[in-house]
Amino acid sequence: MQIKDLFSKKKYATIPSERPKRDIPEGLMNKCSKCGTIQYSKELDKNLKVCSSCGHHYRLSAWERIGMTLDDGRLYEYDADMESVDPLEFPGYKGKLEQQRQKNPNLREAVVTGEGTINGHPVVVAVMSFDFFSGSMGSVVGEKITRAIEAAHEKKLPLLIFSTSGGARMQESILSLMQMAKTSAALSMFQGAGGLFISVFTDPTMGGVSASFASLGDYNLAEPGALVGFAGRIVIEQTIRQKLPDNFQTAEFNMQHGQLDLVVHRKDMKTTLGKLLDMHTVREGLSHGG
């Protein structure tokens, strides 16, 4: 062997595998974003999309949540065809709206409203979806929620809103911000007439939604670990120049500081809502004599 042979690269032969490569079907498994546990999607669905290892609550679409909450998953939908236009002719907005509708064929906007029952109790519901434009509140979202509030007022039914949002929709500017006042004013009239409003925060509920109707419930509930706040953590830390607690703006942190009434696991949500509705329902034949 010559010295130069010591520094020469060895040549390796590639032996083809006798076993064919098996492709794993897309969507067969999910990896938990919190603990990293890999689970079969079917098992995750059976567990209401809650991680069996750490309890992390995955985000749900509006229709998934409706299916888990309402009796038989049935909803008489309000304003199903209402959709956003481009009132301010914001550059690129129309195209983005169309992209969102193609990505979410079962949604026309970031909220679904309607009427159903929970444990036999009729209720008006509004369920937001983070999948559509990050759940941002524009004119149509505000209008649909306002109409749902007015329907509950007119029919004397309890109102239930599941919120999830990144905040106001910037492409609609002041028209978007106006929805904060509009929804809050409608709630004030509804609650002033004795209407019951149950608000449920889901991950995440931020910005103009958390600062308006979502925080005005007679009962304010949240799912475990839900991010609930107004401005983002980084913005606040840069403003006050202080390090915030690790659990800052979580549902648990908000409940500890009096901003929420109860943090409810997803598997217990329908039962809890049913109990609250029971408490506020006058049964037929109930005597009010004294």
Curated annotation (Swiss-Prot):
Under Enzyme Commission nomenclature, its number is 2.1.3.15
CC cofactor:
Zn(2+)
Query: Mind listing the GO molecular function terms for this protein?
Result: acetyl-CoA carboxylase activity; ATP binding; carboxyl- or carbamoyltransferase activity; zinc ion binding
Please list the residues that bind Zn(2+). Answer: C32, C35, C51, C54
Asked if the Swiss-Prot or TrEMBL record annotates the protein with the keyword Chloroplast, the reply is no
Quaternary form?
A: Acetyl-CoA carboxylase is a heterohexamer composed of biotin carboxyl carrier protein (AccB), biotin carboxylase (AccC) and two subunits each of ACCase subunit alpha (AccA) and ACCase subunit beta (AccD).
What domain of life does the UniProt record list for this protein's source?
Bacteria
Q: Which residues form the CoA carboxyltransferase N-terminal domain?
A: 28-290
Pathway(s) served: Lipid metabolism; malonyl-CoA biosynthesis; malonyl-CoA from acetyl-CoA: step 1/1
What keywords tag this UniProt record?
ATP-binding, Cytoplasm, Fatty acid biosynthesis, Fatty acid metabolism, Lipid biosynthesis, Lipid metabolism, Metal-binding, Nucleotide-binding, Transferase, Zinc, Zinc-finger
According to the record, cofactor stoichiometry and binding are noted as: Binds 1 zinc ion per subunit.
**Gene name of the record:** accD
Cited function: Component of the acetyl coenzyme A carboxylase (ACC) complex. Biotin carboxylase (BC) catalyzes the carboxylation of biotin on its carrier protein (BCCP) and then the CO(2) group is transferred by the transcarboxylase to acetyl-CoA to form malonyl-CoA.
Q: Which reaction does it catalyse?
A: N(6)-carboxybiotinyl-L-lysyl-[protein] + acetyl-CoA = N(6)-biotinyl-L-lysyl-[protein] + malonyl-CoA
Q: Which family does it belong to?
A: Belongs to the AccD/PCCB family.
The entry's protein name is Acetyl-coenzyme A carboxylase carboxyl transferase subunit beta
GO cellular-component terms in the record? acetyl-CoA carboxylase complex
Q: Where in the cell is it found?
A: Cytoplasm
Question: SUPFAM superfamilies from the xrefs?
Answer: ClpP/crotonase
Where are zinc fingers of the kind C4-type found along the chain?
32-54
Q: Which HAMAP family match?
A: AcetylCoA_CT_beta (MF_01395)
Enzyme class, top EC level, equals transferase
- Database matches in PROSITE patterns: COA_CT_NTER
Gene Ontology biological process terms from the UniProt entry = fatty acid biosynthetic process; malonyl-CoA biosynthetic process
The main location class comes to cytoplasm
